[in-house]
Design a protein with these regions (language model features):
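Aromatic-rich carbohydrate-recognition surfaces in CAZymes
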Residues: 3-99, 120-127
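Residue-level detector of alpha-helix boundaries and kinks
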Residues: 43, 77, 111-112, 146
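Residue-level detector of functional hotspots within protein domains
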Residues: 44, 58-60, 104, 110-112, ...
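Short, flexible helix-coil linker/hinge segments at the edges of structured domains or between repeats
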Residues: 94-114
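Catalytic cores of carbohydrate-active enzymes
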Residues: 1-2, 103-104, 115-119, 125-213
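Short loop/turn segments at secondary-structure transitions that flank enzyme active sites
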Residues: 65, 110, 167
Length: 213
């Protein structure tokens, strides 16, 4: 119907392959290595932080694949894949300011703006990506010190998710969708102004692109 690919939906549909279809899963991993990061377009700059969780898809899929099948040869035969995953995490690590928590920003989730300055689900993806690449780094490539660094960063991110991205609810502690800051008064409220835009200004350009034939 349209020339567009919904990366988030494709990622979700690829997850069962990490348990059932190793050959197909490997093709998906290589696909996300090539297309997972939004390219520069006419409406958006693209890049790793356009949708951080989409950019991390290749790492999370790789981690799930290795966790279940334990195949080292695939990664050893694709050194550029490992290099690409390391580069993605390095870009993210370098984005954090010294006075910031160990949480990371994103503009979009997939087809909607991420809620808050720091989006909870995206940072859970960061934690998972740190842990996934740490295991591959150590067990496949023997990079123990690098793996230890990633696990350390994962621990810091997990700690700050629990510290800043939770609130007391009717049934106890619950996770927030996102937070506009780390101060208590900014955790549970955010301005709706930046989310109140016309449909065509929100990146949903496919609406005018449908092939009615």
């Amino acid at each position: 119907v349209t020339p567009h690919v919904w990366n988030k939906d494709m990622y979700y549909s690829s997850l069962p392959f990490t348990l059932t279809e190793p050959e197909l899963c490997k093709k998906c991993i290589l696909w996300f290595a090539k297309y997972g990061i939004k390219y520069k377009g006419t409406k958006f700059e693209g890049g790793v932080f356009h949708s951080l969780s989409n950019s991390l898809s290749v790492i999370m899929l790789s981690g799930a694949y290795y966790e279940y099948f334990g195949e080292k040869e695939f990664f050893q035969q694709h050194p550029k894949l490992y290099k690409k995953m390391k580069a993605i995490l390095q870009t993210v690590l370098e984005s954090r300011e010294e006075n910031e928590p160990y949480l990371y920003r994103t503009t979009w989730i997939s087809d909607a703006y991420a809620l808050g300055k720091y989006h909870t689900g995206t940072n859970l993806c960061m934690y998972r990506s740190f842990m996934a690449l740490a295991r591959i780094a150590e067990e496949v490539f023997g990079e123990k010190s690098y793996a230890e660094m990633l696990r350390s960063e994962a621990g810091k991110t997990r700690k700050d998710i629990e510290r800043y991205m939770t609130a007391k609810g009717l049934f106890g502690t619950q996770y927030l969708e996102g937070i506009s800051g780390i101060a208590e008064e900014k955790k549970e409220c955010d301005s709706a102004e930046k989310y109140q835009k016309e449909m065509l200004d929100q990146g949903l350009q496919f609406i005018t692109d449908v092939n009615h034939d």
